[in-house]
C-alpha cells in the first residue's frame, strides 16, 4: 500500500513538473516570468538554510548558517525586493520615560532591593528592548511591592 502511495506522489510530481514547463512555453508569458516549477522549488529550498537570521544585541544581522556535508550548499542571490536593515539611533532616556509612564511615576527602591532592581533593569530582555518596556514596568512594580522590598 505504501509503495502505491509513493508511486502516486512521484507520478503527480513528475506530471506537475512537465505541465508547468509546457505551460511556460506559451507566447503570452514574459521572459522575466519564465521559470519552471522545478526552478522555483530549488530556489525555495536553497533560500531556507541560507536566510537564517541571527540577532545579536539590538540589531539583527543575516549570517549564512554552517552547512553539514549532506545539505546542499547552493548560494542563490537574494530577491531585489528585500528590505535593507535600518539602524536608528535610540534616545538613552527613552527607557526611563516609558517605564515612568507605565508605572505612573518614578519607582523608588530601598537599598535592600537595589541589586535586584539593577539585575532586572540592566540584564533582562524585558528592560532592554523597546517592545518589552511594558513588561519591564510590570516586573519593577511587582519587585517594589514584594515583601523583600517592603520590609524596611
UniProtKB/Swiss-Prot annotation:
<keyword id="KW-0964">Secreted</keyword>
<feature type="disulfide bond">
    <location>
        <begin position="113"/>
        <end position="149"/>
    </location>
</feature>
<feature type="disulfide bond">
    <location>
        <begin position="127"/>
        <end position="136"/>
    </location>
</feature>
<keyword id="KW-1015">Disulfide bond</keyword>
<dbReference type="GO" id="GO:0005125">
    <property type="term" value="F:cytokine activity"/>
</dbReference>
<dbReference type="GO" id="GO:0050935">
    <property type="term" value="P:iridophore differentiation"/>
</dbReference>
<dbReference type="GO" id="GO:0030971">
    <property type="term" value="F:receptor tyrosine kinase binding"/>
</dbReference>
<keyword id="KW-0732">Signal</keyword>
<keyword id="KW-1003">Cell membrane</keyword>
<dbReference type="InterPro" id="IPR029364">
    <property type="entry name" value="ALKL1/2"/>
</dbReference>
<comment type="similarity">
    <text>Belongs to the ALKAL family.</text>
</comment>
<dbReference type="Pfam" id="PF15129">
    <property type="entry name" value="ALKL1_2"/>
</dbReference>
<comment type="function">
    <text>Cytokine that acts as a physiological ligand for receptor tyrosine kinases LTK and ALK. Required for iridophore development in the adult eye by acting as a receptor for LTK.</text>
</comment>
<dbReference type="GO" id="GO:0005886">
    <property type="term" value="C:plasma membrane"/>
</dbReference>
<dbReference type="GO" id="GO:0030298">
    <property type="term" value="F:receptor signaling protein tyrosine kinase activator activity"/>
</dbReference>
<dbReference type="GO" id="GO:0070378">
    <property type="term" value="P:positive regulation of ERK5 cascade"/>
</dbReference>
<feature type="signal peptide">
    <location>
        <begin position="1"/>
        <end position="23"/>
    </location>
</feature>
<keyword id="KW-0472">Membrane</keyword>
<protein>
    <recommendedName>
        <fullName>ALK and LTK ligand 1</fullName>
    </recommendedName>
</protein>
<keyword id="KW-0202">Cytokine</keyword>
<dbReference type="GO" id="GO:0070374">
    <property type="term" value="P:positive regulation of ERK1 and ERK2 cascade"/>
</dbReference>
<dbReference type="GO" id="GO:0005615">
    <property type="term" value="C:extracellular space"/>
</dbReference>
